[in-house]
Amino acid sequence: TLFPYTTLFRSLPELTNLYYEGTKVDAKDICFLGTRDLDKGERELMKKAGVTVFSMTDVERYGFSSIVQKIVQFFTERVDMIHVSFDMDVLDPMFAPGTGIQLPAGLSNREALFLMEEIANTNLVKSAEIVEVNPVLDIRNQTAILAVSLASRLLGEKIY
């Protein structure tokens, strides 16, 4: 399923109703970037929930910078804070070989660093996670080092 933890915890109100009862994140405020392989059930669930999705086809069609501008605008107009969940397997395996799922035609390291910098510039990031780094599959710590660089950019590090 697309949201395994929310599905699992849906029946545990003591975990889902922290601070107040009800939904904490509206699906319409969720944005995915770089999707390459969604199964039919995931696609239907995301469409039904109103999740915004920019696939790698969209990146090719409209250009990466344009998509990032749309994402920044999407969040700055809709929310007061952002949680970033960056899944390293969105990257092309050439740049991140140490992930569990290695699909070709993913984001480049430069695109990912640019994305993190632009999201950081919104000053809306309140929490983040960088996931899917598998050291067993990594080559010369390439994926791990990139993950650290991405976190640094998200925390405000600039090249210049």
Q: Which residues fall in each region the model found?
A:
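Short, small-residue-biased leader/transition segments that mark boundaries at the very start
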Residues: T1-L8
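Solvent-exposed alpha-helices and their adjacent loops that cap or buttress functional pockets
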Residues: Y19-V25, T76
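His/Asp/Glu-rich, glycine-adjacent segments
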Residues: T23, G34, K48-A49
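Conserved phosphate- and dinucleotide-binding cores of soluble alpha/beta proteins
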Residues: F9, E14-L18
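Short, structured patches in soluble enzyme cores that scaffold and shape functional sites
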Residues: D29, G34-D37, S55-T57
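N-terminal catalytic or cofactor-binding beta/alpha core of small enzyme domains
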Residues: N17, T35-L38, K70
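Short, glycine/polar-rich helix-capping loops at beta-to-alpha or helix-loop-helix junctions
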Residues: D37-K48
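Catalytic cores of soluble, metal-dependent hydrolases
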Residues: L45, T52-Y160
